[in-house]
Structures are given as C-alpha cells and as structure tokens.
C-alpha cells in the first residue's frame, strides 16, 4: 500500500512539485566549494552508511537523491566503484554535482548524473549491485513505490543502504515535507514497507547522536530534527 500524503497537501504531485522547487532554490545558490565543505562536514554520517556496503570496487552503484553529491563523492573518495549513477529530481543539485565530477580528483571515475523520479527509476531490472540513499526517503510521498523500484533494479545478492530520520512520536502532518518532517515514518513502519517491497533489514546503525551534533554545531541546517526529537538510522537491506 502506498503512503498517504499529509492532509495539508493536495496530492502526491503537489508534494513533489513543492519539494522540487524548494531544493532547486536551495541548490542553485550553493556553489561547488560549499557542496564540498558540506561533504566533509557530514562524513560522520555518510561514512557509516558507506561502510554497510563496502567494498565497492567493480560494482555498479546508484545514489538515490544525490543532490549536490555529498554522499556520491564521498563514495569515490573511499571506495570507487566501476560506475556511479546519481539520480535526483533537482536540476540545480545535479548541476552542482556535474561540476564537481569534472574536478581533477574525480574526473577519472565513471559517473552518470540523471534527473528522474525516484518512484520510477530509469534503470533496467537487475542491473545494480549497490543502492545508496541518504536523507531522501522522507521526501517521497510514495515510499513503497520507491522501495519496489529499488527491489526491481538490484541484482540478486545486491546490497542496499538507506539512512534517514525517523519519528518517535505522533505523525507530524502539519509540518513541511520539504524539511523531511511531514514525510517521516517510524522504524517499524519503514520495516513493514520494506517487507511489502520484497526487502528485509539485515543490519542497522543508530546515527542519532551524530546528526544531533551536526545540527547543534551548525554543520547541518536542520533544526526541525532537534525540535521533533527524531531518530536517525542507517539500514542495510537485501532482497528477500
């Protein structure tokens, strides 16, 4: 069953358009230098996520919700794969990521940046070795559709690592989807959605304290995370 959008939003399409507009505005004002500084600052969150699927040599890796490349370029620094495909709905974010991919330290690697809907991936079935996604699932109105797409495109034995915030109290329907608030679910709900999509949780890492530290120190502009006392987890998923 698909997730129900919040009552204050008219439709999943409306949620997507508002979210896309918000991130296009945010990323168009962020240069490559700022994006690289953010990648360094968030390494305490990205590195544990990557460690769930390491090593990545000779793998086809997909980063869902690449944005400006905070996770993707950290992958290239730690364990370069055969091919890295970054997918996002934000043209502005992808523009920054494409620029960074041309830097001398990254241009030797094989990278594709694709603008697409994460609920309808432009990828062939059973073509991907590893899927990564960081702080993206909560932006999607239909999380089950996105998880089913992940299950469709991964090869047998593939690994999937997803991290995001999870609510610890009642649904926050009056809050913003764009800030990863209204779209948050509980860990239990996430587990059920994964099972419905043919995926199961093989491991997890609690990164709540790391995110709290980043937000408190002004390294991650996400005050709502603290205001709503959310958890942040990284999950390793495999196909059932």
PLM features per residue range, with description:
Residues 165-181:
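Short, glycine-/aromatic-enriched active-site segment of Class I SAM-dependent methyltransferases
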Residues 130-141:
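A short SAM/SAH-binding and catalytic strip from SAM-dependent methyltransferases
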Residues 62, 68-120:
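Class I SAM-dependent methyltransferase SAM/SAH-binding core
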Residues 39-59, 74:
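Conserved alpha-helix/loop element of class I SAM-dependent methyltransferases that forms part
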Residues 158-164:
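Conserved beta-strand signature within the Rossmann-like core of class I S-adenosyl-L-methionine
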Residues 1-31:
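N-terminal, positively charged/glycine-rich alpha-helical extensions of SAM-dependent methyltransferases
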Residues 144-156:
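A short glycine-rich, Lys/Arg-flanked "PGG" loop and its adjoining helix->strand segment in the class I
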Residues 119-130:
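A short acidic, Gly/Pro-enriched loop at the edge of an enzyme's catalytic core
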